Amino acid sequence: MAKAKFERTKPHVNIGTIGHVDHGKTTLTAAITKVLHDAIPDLNPFTPFDEIDKAPEERQRGITISIAHVEYQTESRHYAHVDCPGHADYIKNMITGAAQMDGAILVVAATDGPMPQTKEHVLLARQSGVPYIVVALNKADMVDDEEIMELVELEVRELLSEYEFDGDNCPVVQVSALKALEGDKEWGEKLLGLMKAVDENIPQPERDVDKPFLMPIEDVFTITGRGTVVTGRIERGVLKVNETVDIIGIKTEKTTTTVTGIEMFRKLLDEGQAGENVGLLLRGIKREDVERGQCIIKPGTVTPHTEFEATAYILSKDEGGRHTPFFNNYRPQFYFRTTDVTGVVTLKEGTEMVMPGDNAEMTVNLIQPVAMEEGLRFTIREGGRTVGAGQVVKINK
């Protein structure tokens, strides 16, 4: 048992299963926990299929999503694995980023080959910034013909290349989740082989503290005799006292200033880092120079923009969304990080309207600039009510 207390030092990676309905995503998830439980019992509990299948609902950015979270460890890593029972849940999870993935296991039934949702999930993985994919060719016990197997593998590789993944070099592992779950030793070994491929082909993600500093401003106030303080949660990076920062977004001009103090829970700190809620004392800045919704950044690392292309999921009526479709020139509020900015929507050519429950591609023109990068997530709101959620795919200007 002494081994377990070292687990904090293991690299942590977030992954998930994606792929067509009934190709065996949930069975594979359960089977992974079983073979790892059998191989390294003191680190891994077994999570049965039923427990994953009845995934609890979560609310993320005003959208309800069913997501199952499973944890397990290989010899070298600690994994958090997400699996969604329904196809709609996948779309919502990918677009809202409810559960960010550092890599995905694409499950394709060898008996069927790639199907429409296989394509859709790979496209969503590309759009939502899932960087790496490992393929599990499932139900391999049901295909005797080696040529069919090779054909399916080829199709999957072509599909991955089509969506700008590394189709030529991506690992494709033949598995039978059901057989492994039933305790078949040979198929259990193949599943361990799949996890070895995941260990070796999904790189360790860069930690938030290693990225350039960024903090969205939540509040601004004046402390008599000390100056202006802005508060917020540091999204990424590290900031030290006396460093220079830029304040960008909302206004047309950026402001450059020096941080003369960093406070947390009324204590003074030498530095603040990703995940911490802090107050920053800014030199020579008046209360009216800064506002909620702007971002404080390491100079030159992010720029404000007004026009971008996005992919968005629009809530259905049952989810508390709109009851009617919207058309070109729709003008909702786009909520980025800590503030709403009005934007005008232009639909993709050939799209007349967007129905509640759809996922849509659109171009947005904001009336004020927002500090953004590709991959930034937002919520679409009308009068404070969430009607959709999306992600910046490409910045135009």
UniProtKB/Swiss-Prot annotation:
Keywords, A to Z?
A: Cytoplasm, Elongation factor, GTP-binding, Hydrolase, Magnesium, Metal-binding, Nucleotide-binding, Protein biosynthesis
Q: Please name the taxonomic classification of the source.
A: Bacteria, Bacillati, Actinomycetota, Actinomycetes, Kitasatosporales
Q: Which SUPFAM superfamilies match?
A: EF-Tu/eEF-1alpha/eIF2-gamma C-terminal domain, P-loop containing nucleoside triphosphate hydrolases, Translation proteins
Provide the E.C. number(s) assigned to this enzyme.
Answer: 3.6.5.3
Tell me what gene encodes this: tuf
The entry's Mg(2+)-binding residues are T26
Q: Which reaction does it catalyse?
A: GTP + H2O = GDP + phosphate + H(+)
UniProt region (G1), positions on chain = 19-26
Principal localization reads cytoplasm
Protein name, UniProt field: Elongation factor Tu
How is this protein annotated for GO cellular component? cytosol
Q: Please tell me whether the keyword ATP-binding is annotated for this protein.
A: no
Region (G5), start-end ranges: 176-178
The segment(s) forming the tr-type G domain are 10-206
What residues does GTP bind to? 19-26, 83-87, 138-141
What EC class is this?
A: hydrolase
